[in-house]
């Protein structure tokens, strides 16, 4: 990790990544289509707070401007000859920082991987910013004038053929939507929803390429395939959105059945803050007597199909979800318990993240946003014992306003099989994909962890939150934790090394990233770094045993929750498709915004190891 600090402020340029991790990584990754050959190259730049303060001290802004106007002026002054649009997902976070996102355009057509994010401080001045705008030669003619490109149906056929998608186009017809050059395909089968196509540019190899962005949700992969607008069997790049009452449950903080016994918990939303004003079983219009509410719909899905509305859920008119589990039972025998556990874990994590700032405006997963901004109608669909796979899990994160989807599988690595729903770390890891994909680049853009290093950090954030939440009061920085050990029945877990601050047990440093070409290995390095961050802050501020943090002047008063808050706030600051150095700078900037930099030394020490 020493290289991460030494990389310094010059890290506005992307880092190169190549090679393979030392050990075969397993679990918690989408099955099916390998998108690694099609990932976008890293192009983002990030101006951290200190550099931004020096750079924009003479920037002209008016005290009468709101934060969106100030952000817009910065983009115009930085790229005066470029065209762009404001993405409609700006908001002010709980730390007082305003977040505004912009998409570059050419001839009125989006450049899909060209983004600019501006973060405005409480004083109305630019706090930090990042961008991946295209600075090369623009197309001289508007492609819509001559329409010298293939129709979207050919692009759909090209994506299916090239990527071997399990979609049958049959008599596909492209039906125009309200948005210009956007189409929905009718007459197909094999996808969970109707495929879509939109005409967009992408930047690649220093040039702009006109493409059809073909969207196909095939379950284990929810893909945006950028098909060349003329040579429709050429797929330039691919983005995958999947990354994947009374309750008798394993209580919050118990990672799996080896750590304790199920207990009775009554009305848990009363102890989890303001994130669920309708309780966990209502959405402001409907009250449910099953494992469904404003935040989560949890059900079984033995067929593995895309239908979920009418799938089985435990039901109790008295809201008494009390079911039995023992380790000799097969998963099917305790599905009521498993669905209830999944419902409990995801709702609790939703409410915890809400307290940290993953709110309606920030793009969280809720049916009813209760007039607080954001798109709504996008609670998380959580499938227990999903029959589409085994020994894994995934979470699909489309943009704000579309449902997130979690698929939890059974694990055949033990006899009897084990249910991943009972390992909280796996559930938290998957839901954290929804968090990071909604926050990085803004809630309207789910493409901002699509590059290799950024995607690796997406995996690392999941492991970080899973590990931070399972810490016990008597743990010390000499305590190590694994991922997936119980479900996989694998001593040492499914990662290369356990998370530990001692380099004799976990020798990973930032320099190891250079030899990796797989997101889970990269994620293990990132989570290892964040585990040091976590313990440095706990050593400074202690660790609360409460589920929800206590806030003092807007910041959690204990180290564990402060670490989780700073990591979350950092996601909102960093550019689309960040690298390690930019993410590090964003976390340090998040501390500057939240505590006036009180924890900079502890953070820098962790990043310099």
From Swiss-Prot:
Its EC number is 3.4.24.-. GO terms for cellular component: extracellular region. Keywords: Glycoprotein, Hydrolase, Metal-binding, Metalloprotease, Protease, Secreted, Signal, Virulence, Zinc, Zymogen. The keyword Membrane does not apply. Its cofactor is Zn(2+). Zn(2+) binds at residues 429, 433. Glycans are attached at residue 270. Its main location: secreted. It is an enzyme of class 3 (hydrolase). Binds 1 zinc ion per subunit. Transmembrane segments: none annotated. GO terms for molecular function: metalloendopeptidase activity; zinc ion binding. The keyword Ubl conjugation does not apply. Residues 1-19 form the signal peptide. SUPFAM superfamilies: Metalloproteases ('zincins'), catalytic domain. One of its GO terms (biological process) is proteolysis. Residues 20-244 form a propeptide. CDD domains: M36. It comes from the Eukaryota. PANTHER family: EXTRACELLULAR METALLOPROTEINASE MEP. Secreted metalloproteinase probably acting as a virulence factor. This is Extracellular metalloproteinase 2. It comes from Trichophyton equinum (Horse ringworm fungus).
């Amino acid at each position: 990790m020493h290289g991460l600090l030494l990389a310094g402020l010059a890290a506005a340029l992307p880092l190169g990544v190549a090679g393979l991790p030392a050990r075969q990584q397993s679990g918690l990754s989408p099955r099916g289509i390998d998108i690694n050959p099609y990932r976008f190259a890293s192009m983002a730049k990030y101006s951290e707070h200190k550099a931004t303060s020096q750079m924009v001290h003479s920037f002209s802004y008016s005290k009468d401007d709101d934060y969106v106007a100030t952000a817009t002026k910065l983009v115009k002054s930085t790229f005066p000859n470029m065209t762009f649009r404001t993405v409609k997902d700006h908001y002010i976070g709980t730390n007082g920082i305003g977040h505004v996102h912009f998409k570059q355009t050419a001839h009125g057509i989006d450049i899909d991987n060209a983004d600019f994010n501006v973060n405005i401080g409480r004083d109305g001045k630019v706090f930090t910013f990042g961008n991946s705008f295209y600075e090369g030669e623009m197309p001289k003619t508007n492609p819509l004038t001559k329409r010298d490109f293939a129709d979207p149906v050919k692009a759909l056929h090209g994506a299916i053929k090239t990527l071997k998608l399990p979609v049958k186009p049959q008599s596909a017809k492209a039906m125009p939507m309200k948005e210009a050059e956007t189409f929905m395909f009718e007459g197909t089968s094999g996808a969970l929803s109707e495929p879509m196509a939109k005409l967009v540019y992408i930047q690649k190899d220093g040039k702009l390429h006109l493409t059809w962005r073909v969207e196909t949700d095939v379950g284990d992969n929810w893909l945006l395939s950028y098909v060349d607008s003329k040579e429709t069997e050429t797929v330039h790049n691919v983005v995958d959105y999947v990354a994947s009452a009374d309750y008798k449950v394993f209580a919050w903080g118990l990672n799996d059945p080896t750590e304790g016994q199920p207990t009775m918990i009554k009305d848990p939303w009363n102890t989890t803050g303001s994130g669920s004003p309708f309780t966990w079983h209502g959405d402001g219009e409907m009250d449910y007597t099953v494992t469904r509410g404003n935040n989560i719909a949890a059900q079984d899905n033995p067929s593995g199909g895309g239908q979920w509305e009418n799938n089985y859920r435990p039901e109790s008119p008295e809201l008494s979800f009390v079911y039995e589990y023992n380790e000799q039972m097969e998963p099917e025998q305790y599905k009521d318990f498993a669905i209830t556990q999944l419902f409990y874990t995801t709702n609790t994590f939703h409410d915890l993240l809400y307290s940290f700032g993953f709110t309606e405006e920030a793009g969280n997963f809720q049916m009813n946003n209760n007039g607080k901004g954001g798109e709504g109608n996008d609670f998380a669909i959580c499938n227990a014992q999903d029959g589409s796979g085994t020994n894994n899990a995934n979470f699909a994160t489309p943009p704000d306003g579309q449902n997130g989807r979690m698929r939890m599988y059974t694990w055949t690595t033990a006899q009897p099989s084990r249910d991943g729903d009972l390992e909280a770390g796996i559930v938290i890891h998957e839901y954290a994909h929804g968090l990071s994909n909604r926050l990085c680049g803004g809630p309207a853009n789910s493409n901002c962890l699509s590059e290799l290093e950024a995607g690796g950090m997406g995996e690392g954030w999941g492991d970080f939150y899973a590990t931070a939440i399972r810490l016990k009061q008597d743990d010390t920085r000499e305590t190590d934790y694994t991922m997936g050990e119980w479900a996989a029945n694998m001593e040492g877990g499914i990662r290369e090394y356990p998370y530990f601050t001692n380099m004799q047990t976990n020798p990973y440093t930032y320099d190891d990233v250079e030899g990796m070409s797989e997101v889970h290995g990269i994620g293990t390095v990132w989570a290892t770094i964040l585990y040091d961050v976590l313990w440095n802050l706990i050593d400074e501020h202690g660790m609360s045993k409460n589920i929800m943090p206590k806030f003092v002047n807007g910041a959690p008063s204990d180290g564990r929750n402060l670490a989780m808050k700073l990591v979350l706030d950092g996601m909102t600051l960093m550019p689309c498709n960040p690298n390690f150095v930019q993410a590090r700078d964003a976390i340090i900037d998040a501390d500057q915004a939240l505590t006036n930099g009180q924890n900079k030394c502890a953070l820098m020490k962790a990043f310099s190891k």
